[in-house]
UniProtKB/Swiss-Prot annotation:
GO terms for biological process: regulation of glutamine family amino acid metabolic process. Involved in the regulation of glutamine synthetase GlnA, a key enzyme in the process to assimilate ammonia. When cellular nitrogen levels are high, the C-terminal adenylyl transferase (AT) inactivates GlnA by covalent transfer of an adenylyl group from ATP to specific tyrosine residue of GlnA, thus reducing its activity. Conversely, when nitrogen levels are low, the N-terminal adenylyl removase (AR) activates GlnA by removing the adenylyl group by phosphorolysis, increasing its activity. It catalyses: [glutamine synthetase]-O(4)-(5'-adenylyl)-L-tyrosine + phosphate = [glutamine synthetase]-L-tyrosine + ADP; [glutamine synthetase]-L-tyrosine + ATP = [glutamine synthetase]-O(4)-(5'-adenylyl)-L-tyrosine + diphosphate. Pfam families: GlnD_UR_UTase (PF08335), GlnE (PF03710). Its cofactor is Mg(2+). InterPro entries: GlnE (IPR023057), GlnE_rpt_dom (IPR005190), NT_sf (IPR043519), PII_UdlTrfase/GS_AdlTrfase (IPR013546). Its EC number is 2.7.7.89, 2.7.7.42. GO terms for cellular component: cytosol. This is Bifunctional glutamine synthetase adenylyltransferase/adenylyl-removing enzyme. It comes from the Bacteria.
Length: 947
């Protein structure tokens, strides 16, 4: 256990800390020596012991035990049984996990056991924690909602299927756990005052189990729980019955799900007689009775996707996903399992090393190849475990830092980093050699077959019966008649267009590629008509056809985005200049950073002469469309959550407002000069106040801009141009010009719909308010609903003096003491008036914004609470957006955390729905039974506060 000199100081520092903490003195010398060694290698071990006094005392005894894994479940069950509440249970789980992980890491770093023993301990620890958490929560849920039963009244358990390395008993040190929840039969609970359906019971139970294991607390977390391998992924139900599970795998199960199901294992399966039924049900899906060579192609496609991901994410030195890494060894084993497992019982093992033994017995690989794979697997898995145990981080990427490299080489008992890299590369090269021989790329034949089918689809586009045959037999689509009709109509419409020889030649080259891309997508029924509509619009512009023909990546992105969103499809059809943005997917899916919109827009406009107002207006619209395309693409790809989508849309709007004000100022000042009061100061003496969605950082894709204009021009000030006018008249002309720039329809459409009716006195008031008049109006004449609007108002453009003036007015007005009952009455009356005017008129539909329990109720409640309590708690005026207003209401003690968090969750869920309905060009109304729980939360809060 010799440490390199560079690591001795790390160890001595850890030992000194341990001595000062007082726990080292009670340890035997052997344990102290071991600690000196492992503390230099693992920050996780050192920090966990230092944080946990009980662990420090128990550690020597723990280290002397050789079979701790055999008692994981009984010890954890006893600890959980003593927990009086959920919080204490969560603490027990996290402490138990961390203590046992220190034990495992300690043994790993000392090489005190084999890799197989280490993986067994890690897997059995995870299984114990999952199963005992389930047992603990099952009892609590039964006490709350009754025991779930079938039609015969028999109690129903929930079975938890461990997938991946957990299922295979080969879990790595800092691994996620992939789970699927299922239960035998439908029915309802018995023994409680009110029965609920088994599906509802098990969904609630599943949510509690995930929370108990996954939630980050003061003590950390147990495991990241990943439920995405369940049927239908994230969009599917959290828990399914056996019958629903069987239907899914028989009718919709995909190749990768077969691949994943090989290692599936029920946690605590010996406790369930129902386990065998589940096993029998799943086996035919995983292992086919015939020899199934299609598995090679499926795994090849999966490997290709992984390779692309490695390139995209720049994952160099990745021992799992890189060429010859752990994943390739797993693929080699699983290709034989999928091809021959239906006939060969020795290939049905979950563990990889046992499967390799079966492969050798059946002489499917040479003994030398199997030996190389086994050696590489053991080496790479040990390297992975030690790498993760250094800081309890989920990583398979070798470190860049010299000291971390030295630690890892030392942990692997190698003299230098260079030696570690050399050995790692030798193992990975041998693996990749076997992988390439067995699964390597074989794209050419398949590619030409696919191309032939799609050439035929285009060449025969006037023969419906032939088209349907190709669609049904070769491409294997459902409802081929619908697709064939769309293709025939498209080709007939093209005949009426004036395409030159070059255009027709490009189109004939392009169309088979289009079909290839469209039918590779699972939602081709949406993608095909949208893509054909776009091509119909651009077919006379050969440049754009050539762009798609010469850039396969652009074509793939076009199909993906059109399939996902009719809004984007329509935008690309209307403004084909945006097709250029599809060439670089990396840029397409990475919106401009929030703080860069202003500078990016300035750079974008800099290429156009300042005095070319028409081109400047066109460029503004193009910039907006490019940015919205990138934001929407990132939204569809799941890169941006709803709050971030709104942030991007809002920062984009603010950048455009700044540019529009600058353009308008240039045009108006060129004619009249500038007001003299701004000559000796920075800025324009002008401000734009954003209300509503732009004020609250909550813009959607189709949002208008609610804005109010202000200036600080004194009376009797004039402009200094050849054509002198009153300063206040100048600001009126400026505002009119701004509105003109926003609303003029150019070749690229309008910029934004602008609404200025929230200004003092509404449509009959001055278009631009002097700051003092704005202040007077808000204090003396404004209605309560105007003060509500002020809650969501902030300056989105303007000089510092105006920012201070607006802030002071807003703060003072919102902090005015108000009669609570009068305020309640006025807010409720305004809400009812809005609902009567704007609420849903469709039977069986819920209007997300305006109906009872919707977004507007949440907004009105936030506004009421700010107006009612700000005189006592002025910090409530700090934010303009609803989420942070509710967070401030918690912080200021106005609203209970549970209630506020429910309202935040309801608000974000409903906004998310509206965002995605915008992408689909759908109205903001949904079926009546959607958001039932969220609407109930909102109604309860509304009734409580407005009682």
């Amino acid at each position: 256990m010799q440490l390199p000199s560079s690591l001795v100081s790390v160890a001595e520092s850890a030992v000194q800390n341990a001595q000062e903490a007082g726990y080292l003195q009670s340890w035997p010398n052997e344990v102290v020596e071991q600690f000196h060694y492992v503390s230099a290698l693992s920050q996780f071990i050192t920090e966990t012991i230092h944080r946990d006094e009980a662990l420090a005392q128990q550690l020597p005894t723990m280290l002397s035990e050789l079979s701790r894994h055999q008692a994981y479940r009984t010890r954890l069950a006893a600890l959980l049984a003593e927990c009086p509440d959920e919080m204490s249970g969560h603490r027990v789980l996290r402490q138990f996990r961390n203590r046992e992980m220190v034990y495992i890491a300690w043994k790993d770093f000392l090489h005190a056991w084999t890799l197989e023993e280490s993986l067994r301990h890690l897997s059995q620890l995870a299984e114990a924690m999952i199963f005992e958490t389930y047992q603990w929560q099952y009892k609590i849920c039964c006490a709350e909602w009754g025991t779930p039963t079938n039609a015969e009244g028999e109690a129903q358990p929930m079975l938890i299927i461990g997938m991946g390395k957990l299922g295979g008993g080969e879990l790595n040190f800092s691994s996620d756990i992939d789970l699927i929840f299922t239960y035998p039969e439908n029915g309802e609970t018995q023994g409680a005052r009110r029965s609920i359906a088994n599906a509802q019971f098990f969904t609630r139970l599943g949510q509690r189990i995930i929370k108990a294991l996954d939630q980050q607390t003061f003590d950390g977390f147990c495991y990241r729980v990943d439920m995405r391998l369940r049927p239908f992924g994230e969009s599917g139900p959290l828990v399914m019955s056996y019958a629903a599970l069987e239907d899914y795998y028989q009718e919709q199960g995909r190749d990768w799900e077969r691949y994943a199901m090989i290692k599936a294992r029920v946690m605590g399966c010996e406790m369930y007689p129902q386990y065998q039924e589940l096993r029998k049900m799943l086996r035919p899906f995983v292992f086919r009775r015939y020899i199934d060579f299609s598995a090679i192609q499926s795994l090849r496609r999966m490997k290709s996707m992984i390779s692309s991901e490695v390139r995209r994410r720049g994952l160099t030195n990745n021992i799992k996903l890189g060429a010859g890494g752990i994943r390739e060894i797993e693929f080699i084993a699983q290709v034989f399992q999928l091809i021959r497992g239906g006939r060969e019982p020795s290939l049905r093992n979950r563990g990889l090393l046992e499967t390799l033994s079966g492969i050798e017995e059946l002489a499917l690989l040479t003994p030398q190849e199997v030996s190389n794979l086994e050696a590489a697997y053991k080496y790479l898995r040990q390297l992975e475990n030690l790498l993760q145990a250094m800081a309890d981080k989920q990583t398979q990427t070798l470190p860049d830092c010299d000291i971390e490299r030295l630690k890892l080489a030392t942990a692997m008992q190698l003299e230098s980093w260079d030696l570690l890299i050399e050995q790692t590369q030798q193992h990975m090269n041998k693996v990749h050699q076997v992988f390439e021989t067995l699964i390597g790329d074989d794209e050419e034949d398949e590619g030409s077959t696919i191309a032939r089918h799609f050439h035929e689809l285009w060449d025969m586009a006037n023969k419906q019966d032939v088209l349907e045959l190709i669609l049904e037999q070769d491409i294997q689509v459902e409802e081929p008649a619908i697709f064939s009709k769309a293709i025939i109509n498209f080709k007939a419409d093209l005949a009426k267009k004036t395409l030159g020889p070059r255009g027709r030649e490009v189109l004939n080259r392009l169309m088979p590629k289009v079909f290839d891309a469209v039918f590779a997508h699972p939602d081709a029924q949406f993608g095909l008509p949208r893509v054909l509509h776009l091509l119909h619009n651009i077919c006379t512009r050969t440049t754009y056809l050539e762009l798609l023909d010469e850039h396969p990546a652009a074509l793939v992105q076009l199909v993906r985005l059109c399939t996902a969103s009719p809004m984007i499809s329509e935008q690309l059809s209307r403004y084909p200049i945006l097709l250029d943005e599809l060439i670089d997917p990396q840029q397409l899916y990475n919106p401009i950073p929030l703080d860069s919109y202003r500078t990016e827009l300035r750079d974008f406009l800099a290429r156009i002469p300042e005095d070319d107002m028409e081109q400047q207006m066109e460029a503004l619209r193009q910039f907006k469309q490019i940015c919205i395309l990138r934001i929407a693409a990132a939204d569809i790809a799941g890169v941006l959550p709803v709050m971030k989508v709104s942030d991007h849309l809002t920062y984009l709007a603010e950048a455009i407002v700044e540019a529009v004000v600058s353009q308008a100022w240039l045009q108006v000042s060129e004619k009249y000069g500038e007001p003299t009061h701004v000559k000796d100061r920075e800025g324009k003496g002008f401000a734009v106040i954003g209300y509503g969605k732009v004020g609250g950082w909550e813009l959607g894709y189709n949002s208008d801009l609610d804005i109010v204009f202000m200036h600080d021009c004194p009376v009797n000030v004039y402009t200094d141009g050849k054509k002198e006018i009153d300063g206040r008249q100048f600001y009126l002309r400026l505002a009119q010009r701004i509105i003109h720039i926003f609303s003029t329809r150019t070749a690229s459409g309008i910029l934004y719909e602008v609404d200025t009716r929230l200004r003092p006195s509404g449509a009959s008031g001055l278009l631009v308010s002097p700051t003092d008049a704005f202040d007077d109006y808000q204090h003396q004449d404004a209605w309560t609903w105007e003060h509500q609007a002020l809650v969501r108002a902030r300056m989105i453009y303007g000089d510092e003096p105006l920012a201070i003036a607006f802030h002071n007015t807003r703060h003072d007005v919102l902090c005015k003491p108000r009669d609570e009952q009068t305020l309640k009455k006025e807010v409720v009356e305004m809400r009812e008036k809005m609902r009567d005017h704007l609420g849903g008129k469709k039977s069986g539909r819920f209007m997300i914004k305006q109906d009872v329990g919707g977004i507007t109720d949440i907004e009105f409640l936030a506004q009421y609470l700010v107006l009612n309590y700000s005189h006592e708690k002025p910090k409530l005026t700090r934010w303009c957006d609803n989420v942070r207003i509710y967070e401030t209401l918690i912080a200021q003690g106005v609203m209970e955390e549970d209630q506020a968090m429910q309202l935040i969750r309801a608000y974000t869920a409903m906004r998310n729905e509206i965002h995605h309905r915008n992408l689909l060009n759908l109205d903001a109304d949904v079926v009546e039974d959607k958001f039932v729980a969220e609407r109930e939360w909102v109604k309860q809060a509304w009734n409580q506060w407005f009682a």
